[in-house]
Curated annotation (Swiss-Prot):
Swiss-Prot/TrEMBL keywords: Sporulation, Toxin, Virulence
Family per similarity comment: Belongs to the cyt1/cyt2 endotoxin family.
Organism: Bacillus thuringiensis subsp. medellin
GO molecular function: toxin activity
Gene: cyt1Ab1
Keyword Transmembrane helix among UniProt keywords: no
Protein name, UniProt field: Type-1Ab cytolytic delta-endotoxin
GO biological processes: sporulation resulting in formation of a cellular spore
UniProt KW Secreted keyword: no
GO cellular component, one term: extracellular region
């Protein structure tokens, strides 16, 4: 019997951001602020758009939790840091709570890319927990698939950083954030920033065009947390926050 918690990878290979029908509004945002580059790809599943500004504000807050990787990995790559994220969470207003966090390594040797995707999905599903409605699972599967495939179309995006390269290995980081408000989350919004530090035993030219059927060896560090904040209506934010957050993005 097919596992209901898995969206078939084959369904999203061609267009990983295409979403099946859902009652929730799924919005991928690029927040354009002339004074700040946002290096988190924000994927917001919001049933009530009155809380969309809250999702944007949380994404901006956790941008501060991206830190440089080790010099051995790269000179100027940024990755979401779970430790720094815990510090940032304590400064967010109105206050919320970190209900789960993870700093975990997963690896594989010469196996299909789809196998690595499923390993990472298992880690992130344990973080998301109660928020895992079917639509959220589909978005999560799409995002993780896009972390390891379709990289040629993302290679210059702000959420991906290319690290050191050799004739046998390519390093990169990938940062994504989920903000979820639906029937499962109740009176809170869940914010789940995720940072990946990825080492692939392949040259960059091959990494850029990997598909889920290809085989590769990986070492991946995953850092993430789940932050729960009581729902905040857009009307409760100052008008300046509203203007700066959504100008040119919605």
């Amino acid at each position: 019997m097919e596992n209901p918690n898995h969206c078939p990878l084959e369904d999203i290979q061609v267009n990983p951001w295409k979403t099946p029908q859902s009652k929730a509004r799924v919005i991928t945002l690029r927040i354009d602020d002339p004074n700040e580059i946002n290096n988190l790809l924000s994927i917001n599943e919001i049933e009530n758009t009155n809380y969309l500004l809250q999702a944007i504000m949380l994404a901006n807050a956790f941008q501060k939790a991206l830190v440089p990787t080790s010099t051995e990995f790269a000179e100027d790559a940024l990755q979401f840091s779970m430790t720094k994220g815990l510090e940032v969470a304590n400064t967010i207003s109105p206050p919320g709570a970190v209900v789960q966090y993870v700093d975990q390594n997963v690896s594989q040797t010469n196996n299909q890319v789809s196998a690595m995707i499923n390993k990472v999905l298992d880690v992130l599903k344990s973080i998301l927990g109660v928020a895992l409605g079917q639509s959220v699972i589909e978005q999560l599967t799409s995002a993780v698939t896009n972390t390891f495939t379709n990289l040629n179309t993302q290679k210059n995006e702000a959420w991906i950083f290319w690290g050191r390269e050799t004739s046998t290995q390519t390093n990169y980081t990938y940062n994504v954030l989920f903000a979820i408000q639906n029937g499962q989350t109740g009176g809170v919004m869940y914010c789940v920033p995720v940072g990946f530090e990825i080492k692939v035993s392949a040259v960059k030219e091959r990494v850029l065009f990997l598909t889920i059927q290809d085989s590769a060896s990986y070492n991946v560090n995953i850092q993430s947390l789940k932050f729960a904040q009581p729902l905040v209506s857009a009307s409760e934010y100052p008008i300046a926050d509203l203007t700066s957050a959504i100008n040119g993005t919605l």
